[in-house]
Amino acid sequence: ETTGETDSSETDTQTQTIAKNQSYYIRISIAKHTLVVYQLDDNKEFSIPVKAFKVALGPKVAPAKTAISEKSLWRKITDIYYVRYSSRLDNAEYLSTATYYSQSDNNLNPKSYNAIGQNVSEGSILMTCANAKWIYENCGAKTTVEIVENFDISSDIKVEDINRIADNAYRDPT
């Protein structure tokens, strides 16, 4: 069962601030399990791709236009799972790492990590540690996140590959 709870001591108050100039816009394709981060161009439109990578999508992820509202370094998402670099969205979804068994870098759930690029039974929008950390550090409160069924991803945009890990590997390789 998802609790969505976090101790206030876990919340990084620095990340409550509004992103500088609302620099980024995040778009997620449900069909492609892909997240693309865009930045503003000279015409003040979000058209310049900055990052593109695969994500795992939880069972409740649905089309929505939302925004980052709060962040936590670690968040307990169920009775047995935690995620790191968690960015909560206004629609109650989360952008975060794959799941961990405890609040330890050495206790990754390898099955969750290897599911990046697919649907998963737990969590919201899961990604590698490096990508979750990038969003955590660069996309502040009120950064728009648009979740859509599908959109065309230009062939110019390189979507990062996922290197699968062994079933007994408990550390994110990124």
Predicted feature residues:
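Exported/periplasmic cell-wall-interacting domains
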Residues: T78-T174
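Gly/Pro-biased beta-strand-loop elements
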Residues: D12-L108
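N-terminal, intrinsically disordered, polar/charged segments of Gram-positive cell-envelope systems
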Residues: E1-N21, P173-T174
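Generic detector of intrinsically disordered, low-complexity, polar/charged segments
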Residues: T2-S9, V55, T78, N114, ...
